[in-house]
Amino acid sequence: MARPRSLVSPLLSGVFCQCDTVSGAPHSHETPASPSLAAAALAADPCGGLLCGGPEHERRLQILFQELDVNKDGAICINDLAVGLKRLGVHRTELELRKIVKAGDKDQDGQLDFDEFVHYLRDHEKKLRLVFKSLDKKNDGRIDAQEIMQSLRDLGVNISEQQAEKILKSMDKNGTMTIDWNEWRDYHLLHSAENIPEIILYWKHSTIFDVGENLLVPDEFTVEEKQTGMWWRHLVAGGGAGAVSRTCTAPLDRLKVLMQVHASRSNNMSILGGFTHMIREGGFRSLWRGNGINVIKIAPESAIKFMAYEQIKRIIGSNQETLGIHERFVAGSLAGVIAQSSIYPMEVLKTRMALRKTGQYQGVLDCGKKILLQEGLSAFYKGYVPNMLGIIPYAGIDLAVYETLKNAWLQRYATSSADPGVFVLLACGTVSSTCGQLASYPLALVRTRMQAEASVEGAPQMTMSKLFKHIVKTEGAFGLYRGLAPNFMKVIPAVSISYVVYENLKLTLGVQSR
């Protein structure tokens, strides 16, 4: 269903520059049949926009501010904005209104005074102008359906021409099936969204979803985010969210490792039985064995993956700010291989610490020292091959499923709302991550068993292929999925906790929520 067309009154559009961005010619208004007193005052059209600073500039802003200041207290609150815009024929959701006030509220008193209001409009128009130019691929001062399709395609979203025309019609006031600068600006006036590509930015997910396996393809960051330092704030927020999430779900993660290594047909370990065994052997605190090193490795792995991803993007020669789906998969998988190769000894330490018995090691350093002395340096790379092979199905299937779900939602709802909402984001991320884990789980199990070989009494030293054959022969295909139940049990709480902590850390670090 197409988005209802927003009829912007002359009072609103009059506060902006009315010059055509290409020719510089003034853009004429059609005077309404029954204009209000305030609108009539703005009917004259000398260039009085925010950026041009014409003679009518200050007066127009004052009149608009007074119209929106419904209770006449010298400030615009969310309720004033809702009522005032509705009177002027502009309808915004409560969430959009909150974002507008938050974006302009410099003193954080929950409302906009005149100076804050002017600053918000000035800043907003500059952003809108930059976005308009980026979408105007033909450089002719107008955006058509093909340019909308191309812009979204560059960001990994494929929509039909019919869908693009629906988006176009929601902004096209004169029926030309193109959008000029004034139509673009008027439509987005006092709207929290700043661009069509922002639809995509809602769908960033790898920094939010931490389910214990950091194998997702990295998110894209815009040039603006890189220049302003927002990229590292996102990574720090994601790392903090991952640390809290992993700590909260650590008992399930340790149970998964125990079942992967010790469960078999002769030792059919249940979830309840596994927890009982851990508590009896080492007490309640033993449920968190291996969690420390699992949290510590988040920072180096995320940093190395991000840097590798950016370098690989340059090597493959992409001049685009964001990559296509296939390029993202290749670059993301290679970045994952580099990051995992760099921190893989920490993966082995995590497995050994999770499997340790009470008193076996004094800590992570003691564990590493004993492995080095007793097994040699090569022990820190046991299970390396299946781990690397697991990156491809995990990252590929997660990306493919997520993009499929994203496109399905956008095809149906993007013309009525850019924001998919928390539930849709969490649901899509959970489903795609679960599918990725399911596909790569046999490789993950073989990796864990190879990492644990020397710590398990009587365990045979096998290559990856021999271990696969041994498991299938002795336990059947089901043996490749030991520990899958606790692994899936932790997905929903892990994703939910990650999201909540991530959003709160973003606010603390000063990252503006989209």
From Swiss-Prot:
InterPro entries listed in its UniProt record: EF-hand-dom_pair, EF_Hand_1_Ca_BS, EF_hand_dom, GDC-like, Mit_carrier, Mitochondrial_sb/sol_carrier, Mt_carrier_dom_sf
Topological domains, Mitochondrial matrix: 253-289, 347-382, 444-482
Solcar repeats: 229-315, 323-408, 420-508
Key words of the record: Calcium, Membrane, Metal-binding, Mitochondrion, Mitochondrion inner membrane, Repeat, Transmembrane, Transmembrane helix, Transport
GO cellular component: mitochondrial inner membrane
GO biological process terms, semicolon-separated: ADP transport; ATP transport
Pfam families in alphabetical order: EF-hand_7, Mito_carr
Binding annotation for Ca(2+) 2: D105, D107, D109, Q111, E116
SUPFAM superfamilies according to UniProt: EF-hand, Mitochondrial carrier
Residue ranges occupied by any EF-hand domain in the UniProt entry: 56-91, 92-122, 123-158, 159-194
Keyword Transmembrane found: yes
Major site of localization recorded for this protein: mitochondrion
Mode of membrane association: Multi-pass membrane protein
Signal peptide: none
GO MF: ATP transmembrane transporter activity; calcium ion binding
Residues binding Ca(2+) 1: D69, N71, D73, D80
Subcellular location field: Mitochondrion inner membrane
Mitochondrial intermembrane face of the membrane: 1-234, 310-332, 403-425, 503-514
Task of the protein: Calcium-dependent mitochondrial solute carrier.
Family: Belongs to the mitochondrial carrier (TC 2.A.29) family.
Protein name: Calcium-binding mitochondrial carrier protein SCaMC-2
Lineage: Eukaryota, Metazoa, Chordata, Craniata, Vertebrata
